Protein backbone atom coordinates (compact mmCIF):
# COMPACT_ATOMS: atom_id res chain seq x y z
CA UNK A 1 0.00 0.00 0.00
CA UNK A 2 2.93 2.31 0.62
CA UNK A 3 3.87 1.60 -2.99
CA UNK A 4 0.51 3.00 -4.08
CA UNK A 5 1.05 6.16 -2.03
CA UNK A 6 4.37 6.69 -3.81
CA UNK A 7 2.71 6.22 -7.19
CA UNK A 8 0.07 8.83 -6.34
CA UNK A 9 2.79 11.39 -5.63
CA UNK A 10 4.00 10.99 -9.22
CA UNK A 11 0.54 10.76 -10.78
CA UNK A 12 0.00 13.35 -13.52
CA UNK A 13 -3.26 12.88 -15.48
CA UNK A 14 -3.47 14.34 -18.97
CA UNK A 15 -7.24 14.73 -19.20
CA UNK A 16 -10.59 13.99 -17.55
CA UNK A 17 -10.60 10.42 -18.81
CA UNK A 18 -7.30 9.78 -17.02
CA UNK A 19 -8.73 11.24 -13.81
CA UNK A 20 -11.91 9.20 -13.85
CA UNK A 21 -9.98 6.13 -14.98
CA UNK A 22 -7.66 6.15 -11.98
CA UNK A 23 -10.59 6.77 -9.61
CA UNK A 24 -12.47 3.87 -11.20
CA UNK A 25 -9.48 1.59 -10.61
CA UNK A 26 -9.14 2.77 -7.01
CA UNK A 27 -12.81 2.14 -6.35
CA UNK A 28 -12.66 -1.40 -7.73
CA UNK A 29 -9.60 -2.10 -5.58
CA UNK A 30 -11.44 -0.61 -2.58
CA UNK A 31 -14.26 -3.11 -3.05
CA UNK A 32 -11.71 -5.93 -3.00
CA UNK A 33 -10.11 -4.39 0.11
CA UNK A 34 -13.36 -4.13 2.09
CA UNK A 35 -14.43 -7.60 0.94
CA UNK A 36 -11.22 -9.14 2.32
CA UNK A 37 -11.42 -7.06 5.49
CA UNK A 38 -14.96 -8.32 6.08
CA UNK A 39 -13.75 -11.90 5.63
CA UNK A 40 -10.80 -11.27 7.94
CA UNK A 41 -12.90 -9.91 10.80
CA UNK A 42 -15.54 -12.61 10.27
CA UNK A 43 -12.80 -15.23 10.56
CA UNK A 44 -11.59 -13.57 13.77
CA UNK A 45 -15.10 -13.72 15.21
CA UNK A 46 -15.46 -9.92 15.33
CA UNK A 47 -18.88 -9.48 13.80
CA UNK A 48 -19.14 -5.73 14.47
CA UNK A 49 -15.98 -4.91 12.52
CA UNK A 50 -17.07 -7.43 9.88
CA UNK A 51 -20.36 -5.59 9.40
CA UNK A 52 -18.52 -2.25 9.27
CA UNK A 53 -16.58 -3.42 6.23
CA UNK A 54 -19.64 -5.07 4.68
CA UNK A 55 -21.37 -1.70 4.90
CA UNK A 56 -18.39 0.06 3.29
CA UNK A 57 -18.35 -2.58 0.55
CA UNK A 58 -22.02 -2.07 -0.33
CA UNK A 59 -21.98 1.73 0.03
CA UNK A 60 -18.85 2.07 -2.09
CA UNK A 61 -20.24 -0.35 -4.67
CA UNK A 62 -23.18 2.03 -5.17
CA UNK A 63 -20.73 4.95 -5.24
CA UNK A 64 -18.68 3.19 -7.91
CA UNK A 65 -21.71 2.59 -10.12
CA UNK A 66 -22.65 6.25 -9.71
CA UNK A 67 -19.22 7.41 -10.85
CA UNK A 68 -19.29 5.22 -13.97
CA UNK A 69 -22.78 6.36 -14.88
CA UNK A 70 -21.83 9.99 -14.28
CA UNK A 71 -18.87 9.72 -16.64
CA UNK A 72 -20.92 7.98 -19.33
CA UNK A 73 -23.83 10.42 -19.04
CA UNK A 74 -21.69 13.56 -18.96
CA UNK A 75 -18.74 12.58 -21.17
CA UNK A 76 -20.45 10.07 -23.45
CA UNK A 77 -17.71 7.46 -23.09
CA UNK A 78 -17.17 4.17 -21.29
CA UNK A 79 -14.58 3.88 -18.54
CA UNK A 80 -12.33 0.86 -19.15
CA UNK A 81 -11.47 -1.38 -16.20
CA UNK A 82 -7.68 -1.44 -15.97
CA UNK A 83 -5.64 -4.33 -14.58
CA UNK A 84 -6.18 -4.51 -10.83
CA UNK A 85 -3.47 -5.59 -8.39
CA UNK A 86 -4.56 -7.92 -5.55
CA UNK A 87 -4.87 -6.35 -2.11
CA UNK A 88 -3.66 -9.37 -0.07
CA UNK A 89 -5.11 -8.40 3.30
CA UNK A 90 -5.42 -11.98 4.57
CA UNK A 91 -2.11 -13.88 4.99
CA UNK A 92 -1.88 -16.85 2.61
CA UNK A 93 -1.21 -19.38 5.38
CA UNK A 94 -4.47 -18.49 7.15
CA UNK A 95 -6.49 -20.38 4.55
CA UNK A 96 -5.39 -23.72 6.02
CA UNK A 97 -6.78 -22.97 9.48
CA UNK A 98 -10.20 -23.07 11.11
CA UNK A 99 -11.50 -19.96 12.87
CA UNK A 100 -11.43 -21.99 16.13
CA UNK A 101 -7.63 -22.14 15.79
CA UNK A 102 -7.30 -18.38 16.36
CA UNK A 103 -5.63 -17.58 19.68
CA UNK A 104 -6.18 -14.33 21.63
CA UNK A 105 -2.62 -13.24 20.83
CA UNK A 106 -3.09 -13.81 17.09
CA UNK A 107 -6.46 -12.02 17.16
CA UNK A 108 -4.99 -8.98 18.93
CA UNK A 109 -2.06 -8.74 16.51
CA UNK A 110 -4.35 -9.20 13.49
CA UNK A 111 -6.75 -6.47 14.59
CA UNK A 112 -3.94 -3.98 15.14
CA UNK A 113 -2.41 -4.71 11.74
CA UNK A 114 -5.80 -4.56 10.01
CA UNK A 115 -6.64 -1.18 11.54
CA UNK A 116 -3.26 0.20 10.47
CA UNK A 117 -3.85 -1.11 6.95
CA UNK A 118 -7.35 0.35 6.90
CA UNK A 119 -6.13 3.79 7.93
CA UNK A 120 -3.26 3.70 5.43
CA UNK A 121 -5.69 2.68 2.68
CA UNK A 122 -8.12 5.53 3.37
CA UNK A 123 -5.31 8.10 3.69
CA UNK A 124 -4.00 6.98 0.30
CA UNK A 125 -7.47 7.17 -1.21
CA UNK A 126 -8.02 10.68 0.12
CA UNK A 127 -4.63 11.78 -1.22
CA UNK A 128 -5.45 10.43 -4.69
CA UNK A 129 -8.94 11.93 -4.83
CA UNK A 130 -7.67 15.33 -3.65
CA UNK A 131 -5.02 15.32 -6.35
CA UNK A 132 -7.63 14.41 -8.97
CA UNK A 133 -9.94 17.17 -7.74
CA UNK A 134 -7.10 19.69 -7.87
CA UNK A 135 -6.39 18.85 -11.51
CA UNK A 136 -10.06 19.19 -12.45
CA UNK A 137 -10.28 22.58 -10.74
CA UNK A 138 -7.11 23.75 -12.51
CA UNK A 139 -8.64 22.68 -15.83
CA UNK A 140 -11.84 24.57 -14.91
CA UNK A 141 -13.89 21.36 -15.14
CA UNK A 142 -16.15 22.51 -12.32
CA UNK A 143 -18.95 19.94 -12.69
CA UNK A 144 -16.40 17.12 -12.73
CA UNK A 145 -14.61 18.74 -9.79
CA UNK A 146 -17.85 18.80 -7.81
CA UNK A 147 -18.38 15.09 -8.48
CA UNK A 148 -14.88 14.12 -7.36
CA UNK A 149 -15.01 16.50 -4.40
CA UNK A 150 -18.02 14.52 -3.14
CA UNK A 151 -15.71 11.49 -2.99
CA UNK A 152 -13.07 13.53 -1.14
CA UNK A 153 -15.60 14.58 1.50
CA UNK A 154 -16.91 11.03 1.87
CA UNK A 155 -13.48 9.51 2.48
CA UNK A 156 -12.53 12.41 4.76
CA UNK A 157 -15.57 11.67 6.94
CA UNK A 158 -14.72 7.95 6.95
CA UNK A 159 -11.19 8.82 8.09
CA UNK A 160 -12.54 11.01 10.88
CA UNK A 161 -14.37 8.10 12.50
CA UNK A 162 -11.63 5.59 11.69
CA UNK A 163 -8.97 7.72 13.40
CA UNK A 164 -11.17 7.98 16.48
CA UNK A 165 -11.50 4.19 16.54
CA UNK A 166 -7.75 3.71 16.10
CA UNK A 167 -7.01 6.13 18.96
CA UNK A 168 -9.58 4.36 21.14
CA UNK A 169 -8.05 0.94 20.46
CA UNK A 170 -4.50 2.20 20.89
CA UNK A 171 -5.39 3.77 24.26
CA UNK A 172 -6.29 0.31 25.60
CA UNK A 173 -3.36 -1.36 23.81
CA UNK A 174 -5.75 -3.32 21.60
CA UNK A 175 -7.18 -5.18 24.59
CA UNK A 176 -8.99 -8.32 23.44
CA UNK A 177 -11.70 -7.85 26.07
CA UNK A 178 -12.24 -4.24 25.03
CA UNK A 179 -12.42 -5.14 21.34
CA UNK A 180 -14.88 -7.94 22.07
CA UNK A 181 -17.01 -5.47 24.03
CA UNK A 182 -17.32 -3.18 21.00
CA UNK A 183 -18.71 -5.79 18.64
CA UNK A 184 -22.40 -5.72 19.59
CA UNK A 185 -22.64 -1.93 19.33
CA UNK A 186 -20.81 -1.85 15.99
CA UNK A 187 -22.94 -4.70 14.69
CA UNK A 188 -26.17 -2.84 15.54
CA UNK A 189 -24.83 0.51 14.31
CA UNK A 190 -23.99 -0.81 10.86
CA UNK A 191 -27.08 -2.99 10.73
CA UNK A 192 -29.06 0.26 10.91
CA UNK A 193 -26.78 2.06 8.44
CA UNK A 194 -27.45 -0.68 5.89
CA UNK A 195 -30.96 0.75 5.59
CA UNK A 196 -29.58 4.11 4.49
CA UNK A 197 -27.43 2.92 1.59
CA UNK A 198 -28.32 4.89 -1.52
CA UNK A 199 -26.72 7.52 -3.74
CA UNK A 200 -28.02 10.08 -6.22
CA UNK A 201 -27.46 9.01 -9.82
CA UNK A 202 -27.64 11.65 -12.52
Which residues make up each language-model segment?
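Iron-associated oxidoreductase/ferritin-like identity signal
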Residues: 1-202
Amino acid sequence: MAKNRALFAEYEPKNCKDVFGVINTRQITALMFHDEMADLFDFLGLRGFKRMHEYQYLAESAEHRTLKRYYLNHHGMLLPDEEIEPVDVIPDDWYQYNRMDVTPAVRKQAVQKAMEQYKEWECGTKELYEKCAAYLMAWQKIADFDKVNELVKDVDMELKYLERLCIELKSVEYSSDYIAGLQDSYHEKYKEKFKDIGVSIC
